[in-house]
């Protein structure tokens, strides 16, 4: 059948205030999405597009009319606020729109006036969807929503009309054009539909009756994929098949890339859309979303892919502590998931235990990644200034048996402070891995290589009497990696001295990690890096400079400079959580990946991706819209750098100007050789009291507040 429709709720309301001119214009530029307008009527019967019947929730009305607060019955519920029925359209000329969801950027607030329905229908060249949420409310004020909608449908092309009120839709039957689809909008199952006095859950059980007055239904997405109380998916319902059997189209609502998705989707909104259109069992007829670009990607480029296909071509997908977005860092489960998800390279951050065993652990401080703070070893916490200024319990304070038998892993939560927690059911799942365990696991897997990251080599040599370079080489040799060529061994470090030592002793692929944000590398520093490294890893901000989560109009030459010197470039650190991405990437990890690897123009042109979520990056490599040249769909082109900032009207709201990033110089790269391994033991830390924090779930209201404070 036809591809599912994409309906832009209030335009591109995930970026701009819902129902604003830039929201509609931006969505209309996508061409393939319909424009949704929530119709409200003014005192003089003019239609405006507004997402909320309470104008104070989405406009500056209360500032202009501070005494305008009223209380009315809305579907039988006493509701207090500012209402469009109290104002003539001319009164609203200077009222401007605000974001309706506080966790979104406020930099577009107060800059755009209300859009009348006639303007929305005539100016934005896209299919039109008019939603009438409260017909019975307007009738209290002698305003006929029915007459207004019929008038609009005669003057303009209206493709869809929806309402949660059965009587309103029935009043339109036979009075609108044959091409206009009438759609019954379902609210939560327990709410009562006002004209039938039945709950929406009851109406759902008699879909055949809906066919007499509507061609389709619009349901909240949880009607199709319900979730548990702790936000995991339950088995899908039969509602899609039931609707189709009744001859009804079915549209799913409530999609937004920056909402809390089910943990099954690993914070990947594209994966959620695919669950509704490409699951092998059913496909909805449309998706109502605040971010129309992501479902367009899903439909146009990511449907019907063979996700099991191995593809070790560019961009190289390198895990970061395994699939650490789904399981605790560097555990057996994280590595298994990374391989399962199609990583090309899996990685191990090497630390050392008290008994001299190299292990895979993302931090040298066990407080960061294990349950040591609540164990019998918490009393060993202390400060070692060579490593960090706050107290920690370090891997070299405990033996391997201490760690493996008494501690549990702890999943990383980079955005836990705003309740974007990772996979809480598995927060302590998995087993720790020695380097030897990691090598044995990786060998024989469908990988192009492994990456071993080595930091603190000087400290280990001087203060612990441990030669980590020699230990890594021995472990690699003992595992048989030196006698095979199917998987290459990569060594990554921020220290040139460490890589120089490896180059002297073994033939590995050496990756220099540039751990500061730089715009370019001086020719002399490039020549120096080439002496000891085969590739470089750089931060995302070095590729896409940003200010306050907006891309700035600046293209850094760093990637091209490194590549011109013969150094492939891997970018770190990719995460799926929307809070990790500038707004220009639409709260969509796939959009960010696409921009980073795109060659030419506004693209980053990198050769590899270091990511907590290798499954998202691997799926990108398989998409059907790659290598299309001039025929690449517009939604698969990278954003214009600084383009979104250019839409900000209020100069006071502009992100602060950024100081120029430095250029990487020889002095940044050059280091003295690694010191010889001393005959010593681990230093005794200076003890300090340790505060143990307990993670407590935060309510949705607090989440919104915290998120807004971080913008």
Regions flagged by a language model, labelled:
Residues 1-711:
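Phosphate-group recognition and catalysis centered on beta-loop-alpha active-site segments
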